[in-house]
Amino acid sequence: MNRIETAFKNTKPFIGYLTGGDGGFDYSVACAHALIRGGVDILEIGFPFSDPVADGPIIQKAHTRALEEKTDSTTILEIAKALRETSNIPLVLFSYYNPLLQKGPQYLHQLKAAGFDAVLIVDLPIPQHANESEPFFQALIEAKLFPIVLATPSTREERLLQIRKLAKGFLYYVSQKGTTGIRSKLSDDFSTQIARLRCYFQIPIVAGFGIANRASAAAALKHADGIVVGSAFVEKLEKKISPEELTTFAQSIDPRQ
């Protein structure tokens, strides 16, 4: 059983996101460990990219900081290896399509060997029949990496049916329109949208984009099978808070405690 499947067996996972290399290698690894101590059950590691169009200003700046630290594909592998020395937490690579397309299928096998369990491509086209992304899904399967796929409030039925054939581990529901960022509350149709998705999917449905405090996390977990917190953590890294402070902050968001 994949580590991601195991994470959903007895709880609704708290998923955290950090941009790999933000603040440098050592700080990035220390902050990842801090989130694990703070109760995060699954960790998403962002592959820094020069044009992160799906992200809001907070995470865009994190991509810039990571690139300024010379973070590259090898750095991402080394971060995973460092975490695997002491932790069995499921790891998801959160990336744009272009960096992985340039690296080729062999890099997916390197990700698996380093300790990653899944890959989420934020801008990957979903194949209708045969198009440029279909070989990539096959390459993920061959590398034994789960493809994590996004759905939004505007995703139409025909696309959901295609996603259902491809997604493994969990479905990532983008609960807010627009880019990543901190929101004060969930959208008014959140519960309705989750119910709609359950008509199509048997895998867990996780909500992300905008969840930044205990109240919104608790509200999301009433309907979703897990939550993702990203921008709220990344904003703390921009301020260079200590790993100990990050652990405390993560605990303050987790409504299960």
UniProtKB/Swiss-Prot annotation:
A Pfam family recorded for this sequence: Trp_syntA
GO cellular component: cytosol
Any one Gene Ontology molecular-function term assigned to this protein's record: tryptophan synthase activity
TM regions (residue ranges): none
Its job: The alpha subunit is responsible for the aldol cleavage of indoleglycerol phosphate to indole and glyceraldehyde 3-phosphate.
Subunit structure comment from the entry: Tetramer of two alpha and two beta chains.
Protein family per UniProt: Belongs to the TrpA family.
Name of the protein in question: Tryptophan synthase alpha chain
Naturally occurring in which organism (per UniProt): Chlamydia caviae (strain ATCC VR-813 / DSM 19441 / 03DC25 / GPIC) (Chlamydophila caviae)
